[in-house]
Swiss-Prot record:
Keywords: Disease variant, Isopeptide bond, Metal-binding, Nucleus, Phosphoprotein, Repeat, Transcription, Transcription regulation, Ubl conjugation, Zinc, Zinc-finger. InterPro entries: Disconnected-like, Znf_C2H2_type. A zinc finger (C2H2-type) spans 441-464, 833-856, 1035-1058, 1063-1090. One of its GO terms (biological process) is roof of mouth development. This is Zinc finger protein basonuclin-2. It is found in: Nucleus. It comes from the Eukaryota.
């Protein structure tokens, strides 16, 4: 694209102007001598040819004008070049002479190609009706013009260009060519560029694009070429406006304005529609606050010397007031950020008026600063720096109240001069040495003088920009003096650095200054504007936020630089993303997802007495803060955003199931005695607990158990989810997550000891006795099926799963037991959200848990392992201590030996001891596994070990198995015999995470309860697996020895990590997988487990 004019500026494109010579007469223009020919004769002949050509062009003018008038008569016609008479305007530079010299023809000769993707248009051809549409490809003018525009500012955002007339012409054509109106934002920016050009250049650009100066100042064309008043105007589209806005980032004069427009675009989306009575309210507000331009200012402007007025103001009929304020007076950049009434212009040559000291502290005086600007001279080059200064400036005191205009416009620290002390200091400096400082510039913020404007700019950036850079993390109000410090802070993944409530005292002054002063901080704001220029990098303000899983973390976040500076900032077209959207989560095993918490949760600060443990940080439900779990490892490059969407059924299931995913001891008393009136649930992991008839006559107080349950299982519910989230990605946390089955066995042993030592005690025990240490958590056997399956709640099952779960639990009596108050009364509601200690009611169960944590924390939590008297202020610390096998190994083995000597439990001691030894020593103690895997043991002995309960448990649980057979095949792998021996006896059906066996196997177990060999080793294997699986405690992988929270997670681990090391059942049609060869062989050799399979032959 080009600049048009008789004297093209240097470095312009090779476009022909109307007064430039043709190719035939360039030798005459340059007076090139020819050998043997009289040069004077040649010059005279060429001059005659030139005159004749000009006469011919003059004759063609009327005909061309008639053609253009006929073309304008079309209904859909848009503005084109030379459609109106402009000779009456000052500075008229001539019109186009013929079609051969038309601007579009010259542009077509330069091959302005279309930049859209997959468009093969090689040259823009203006449409016959709409000039901005190409006749060849039907694409717009902007898409073609981008081929000639520079895009270096997108890749080098720190560099700015000098405003040149040919570049301004190119950018002006994007919005003025073929249009009849200019968007307001683009006109503001173009006005700013025009203000640094000469008058002749501005007029030449406008006339070259078919606009008059009057129409441009008005913002739209009033009449067409035929004199008809227009009532409809052609204007560029919004997408083209956004692309054009990017071009103004090339210049220091408009860069900061474009950045402010991006901020206002985000803020303007939430502006409400004004009411009908706004006009009167606005008039009242303006008159009462008197914030408009003072009459003296207007008088000064109207009566000022024309020689000192900018050329852009010299417009007939006083159209200068249609321009923005800065064009009326060519003030420098630092003062452009002030409100319109912040300056009082004086006539050139007048001295600075020095107010007396007595009037400086009076707030009823005028709040305008008095400025004596340097007169503008046409022979001077306008200052193009983003930060300039003005000499002879003396701010007066500002009123105590800050106007809304000041709050909304980001300005520099000049408002700090509202204090009388600052004004007095400037006044004193001005009085002391005004004569000696002639030619120097001084800082408007602190009053110091400097040798030149460059030094002032360096000083201003280094000293007075300390509150210009706010942290880009949404909700963090930290401010910094440099972009480097701000970016380093913003990139820190520690969420506590961005929490307002944990702010250090050293930051309060900056924050108070930021919020109290009239100088807002330029913060990074996410805009919804998005437009990708075809064939180019993204050109919109921002691109839509990408999927957090697919988005890689950016090296630094985008921030808008200071208004008056050119700071190193990242590319402006980059998207503004929150830290949560930029996080790239580490690849980890699938675990139970986080159940979002409700937005109405009461927020209680954690008590100071609670020790710092890897606990979960409760998400503060402020709209500006998204906090990450405190336990998340620092390997995560950015904090993880916890989504706040509410799953309606989450609370319902949490309340109904009493968090079955929690680890801990579940007291299931299978006694049919009338002393116990609560419903109990049956779970495969709890079959060891009912081990003798001696214990069946014992009842533990339901009051204390319910109280312990309400204070433990519900409180740990949110913490378990976060543990599941992080345990697979951080193996070293496995020891901390071993909170499941150790509780079961330790508390069972504790219960056995208490019952054996006190055989004659009453059935109900007082609330102050040690029974409070026994906490009750109910493991619903339908939990895995309804929550962890591929159709479960966590995977999108939703309400249908909720209804199905409710029907199952109601029909099979697996629902949550009834709640009891401390007095033993049955509560009316299944889950009354009340505190069982102080009887207070809350809105949600989560509020109850917070209440327990903050109010009833004085009740210490004793270790659940019998014989260990360690007490902790938090359940999390107690559970972590209780789950540590190394701390209780000697204690547990000693108690087991004592229990083995008890003659009242002959059939229990060996079985229970083996169970504990398996758990305590794991794969390092194969004796327990050998006892378990003794396939030749008689079924009667096995059944006597189980006391008849294990079989019923397995039958009832297997009835609920809804698994389907899988066609997955896995290759067997050979590994050490020790790993094979240490494998789990329980099979894993690969396509059903939650089922323990396939449908045929479970059906057979359900319908053959009396077969002596039908359960045998399989039931013992199920017990062994459940002894490792608790409800949410440590389940050890027998291959890699990692700990997992539940059986579902372990099965997924087997499927994703150890699939090649699993061993498939040899019976055709049976898809059971085993982690050891011995377990697989014992399963494959049991014909009773494969009756319903079509092919029952064993390989």
């Amino acid at each position: 694209m080009a600049h048009l004019g008789p004297t093209p500026p240097p470095h312009s494109l090779n476009y022909k102007s109307e007064d430039r010579l043709s190719e035939q007469d360039w030798p005459a223009y340059f007076k090139v001598p020819c050998c043997g020919v009289d040069t004077s004769q040649i010059e005279s002949e060429e001059a005659e040819v030139d005159v004749r050509e000009r006469e011919t062009q003059r004759d063609r003018e009327p005909k061309r004008a008639r053609d253009l008038t006929l073309r304008d008569s079309c209904t859909d016609n848009s503005m084109q070049f030379g459609t109106r008479t402009t000779t009456a305007e000052p500075g008229f530079m001539g019109t186009w002479q013929n079609a051969d010299t038309n601007l579009l023809f010259r542009m077509s000769q330069q091959a302005i190609r279309c930049t859209l993707v997959n468009c093969t248009c090689e040259c823009f051809q203006p449409g016959k009706i709409n000039l901005r549409t190409c006749d060849q490809c039907k694409h717009g003018w902007v898409a073609h013009a981008l081929d000639k525009l520079s895009t270096q500012h997108l890749y080098h955002p720190t560099q700015v260009e000098i405003v040149q007339s040919n570049v301004v012409f190119d950018i002006s054509s994007l919005m003025l060519y073929g249009t009849q109106a200019v968007p307001v934002r683009l006109k503001i920016l173009l006005d700013r560029l025009f203000s640094v050009l000469k008058q002749e250049e501005v007029l030449h650009i406008l006339h070259g694009l078919g606009w008059t100066l009057r129409d441009y100042v008005r913002g739209y064309i009033l009449q067409d070429a035929a004199g008809k008043v227009l009532d409809r105007w052609a204007i560029m589209s919004r997408e083209e406006e956004i692309i054009t806005l990017q071009q103004f980032l090339r210049f220091g004069e408009t860069k900061s304005i474009v950045e402010l427009m991006a901020i206002q675009e985000k803020e303007g989306q939430a502006v409400a529609v004004p009411s009908s009575k706004t006009d009167s309210d606005i008039r009242t507000f303006i008159e009462s606050n008197n914030r408009t331009r003072s009459p003296s200012l207007l008088a000064h402007l109207e009566n000022s010397n024309p020689s000192s007025i900018h050329h852009f103001e010299n417009i007939p009929n006083s159209l200068a007031f249609l321009l923005p304020f800065q064009y009326i007076n060519p003030v420098s950049a630092p003062l452009l950020g002030l409100p319109p009434n912040g300056l009082l212009l004086e006539q050139p040559g007048l001295r600075l008026r020095e107010p007396s000291l007595s009037t400086q502290n009076e707030y009823n005086e005028s709040s305008e600063s008095e400025v004596s600007p340097t007169p503008y001279k046409n022979d001077q080059t306008p200052n193009r720096n983003a930060l300039t200064s003005i000499t002879n400036v003396e701010p007066k005191t500002e009123p105590a109240c800050v106007s809304p205009i000041q709050n909304s416009a980001p300005v520099s620290d000049l408002t700090k001069t509202e204090h009388p002390k600052s004004s007095f200091r400037i006044h004193r400096m001005r009085r002391m040495g005004s004569a000696s400082r002639k030619g120097r510039v001084f800082c408007n913020a602190c009053g110091k003088t400097f040798y030149d404007k460059g030094t002032l700019k360096i000083h201003y950036n280094a000293v007075h920009l300390k509150i210009k850079h706010r942290c880009t993390i949404e909700g963090c109000n930290m401010v910094f003096s440099s972009l480097r410090s701000r970016n380093r802070h913003s990139a820190n993944p520690n969420p506590r650095l961005h929490m307002p409530m944990l702010r250090n005292n050293r930051d309060k002054d900056l924050i108070r200054a930021t919020s109290g002063a009239a100088t807002p901080v330029i913060a990074s704001t996410k805009s919804n504007l998005a437009l990708t220029s075809p064939g180019r990098p993204p050109m919109g303000f921002t691109t839509p936020p990408l999927d957090p899983v697919l988005q890689n973390p950016l090296p630094s976040q985008l921030v808008f630089s200071g208004l008056k500076t050119v700071q190193p900032v990242p590319p402006f077209y980059r998207s503004l993303l929150t830290p949560g959207e930029m996080v790239s989560p580490p690849t980890s095993l699938p675990t139970s997802p986080i159940i979002p918490t409700s937005g109405t949760i009461e927020q209680h600060p954690p008590p100071p007495s609670e020790p710092v443990v890897p606990a979960v940080m409760m998400a503060t439900h402020e709209p500006s803060a998204d906090l990450a779990p405190k336990k998340k490892p620092r390997k995560s490059s950015m904090p993880v955003k916890i989504e706040k969407e509410i799953i309606d059924t989450a609370d319902e299931f949490d309340d109904e199931d009493d968090d079955p995913n929690d680890g801990g001891a579940v007291v299931n008393d299978m006694s049919h005695d009338n002393h116990c009136h609560s419903q109990e649930e049956m779970s495969p992991g709890m079959s060891v607990k009912d081990f003798s008839k001696h214990n069946r006559t014992r009842c533990i107080s339901r009051t204390e158990i319910r109280r312990a349950d309400s204070m433990t299982s519900e409180d740990q519910e949110p913490e378990r989810d976060y543990e599941n989230e992080s345990e697979s990605s951080e193996p070293k946390l496995g020891e901390e997550s071993m909170e499941g089955d150790e509780h079961i066995h330790s508390e069972v042993s504790e219960k056995v000891l208490m019952n054996s030592e006190r055989p004659d005690e009453n059935h109900s025990e007082p609330s102050h006795q040690d029974v409070i240490k026994v906490k009750e958590e109910f493991t619903d056997p339908t939990y895995d099926m309804f929550y962890m399956s591929q159709y479960g709640l966590y995977n999108g099952g939703g309400a249908s799963m909720a209804a199905l779960h409710e029907s199952f639990t109601s029909s099979l009596n697996y629902g949550s037991p009834q709640k009891f108050s401390p007095e033993g009364d049955l509560c009316s509601s299944p889950d009354p959200k009340i505190c069982y200690v102080c009887k207070k009611s809350f809105k949600s169960s989560y509020s109850v848990k917070l209440h327990y944590r903050n109010v009833h924390l004085k009740e210490m939590h004793v270790c659940t392992v019998a014989g260990c008297n360690a007490a902790f202020p938090s359940r999390r610390s107690r559970d972590r201590h209780s789950a540590n096998i190394n701390l209780h190994r000697k204690l547990l083995t000693k108690e087991l030996d004592d229990m083995g000597l008890d003659s009242s439990q002959p059939s229990l001691s060996k079985d229970l001891r083996d169970e504990f030894l398996v758990k305590i020593y794991g794969a390092q103690h194969p004796m327990g596994l050998d006892v378990r895997e003794d396939a030749s043991s008689p079924a009667g002995t096995e059944d006597s070990h189980l006391n008849g309960y294990g079989r019923g448990m397995a039958e009832d649980y297997m009835v609920l198995d809804l698994s389907t057979t899988s066609s997955l095949q896995s290759s067997s792998s050979i590994h050490s015999s020790r790993e094979s021996d240490a494998g789990s006896d329980e099979g894993i059906l690969l396509d059903d995470i939650d089922g323990a066996s396939d449908s045929g196997e479970s059906a057979h177990k359900a319908e053959a309860p009396a077969l002596p060999g039908s359960l045998g080793a399989e039931v013992s294997g199920s017990l062994m697996f459940s002894s490792l699986s608790g409800s949410n405690g440590g389940i050890m992988c027998n291959i890699c020895h990692k700990m997992y929270s539940n059986k579902g997670t372990l099965r997924v681990h087997y499927k994703t990590v150890h699939l090649r090391e699993m061993h498939k059942c040899k019976v055709p049609g049976c898809n059971m997988m085993f982690s050891s060869v011995r377990s697989r062989n014992r399963h494959s050799q049991n014909p009773n487990l494969h009756k319903n399979i079509p092919f029952t032959s064993v390989d």
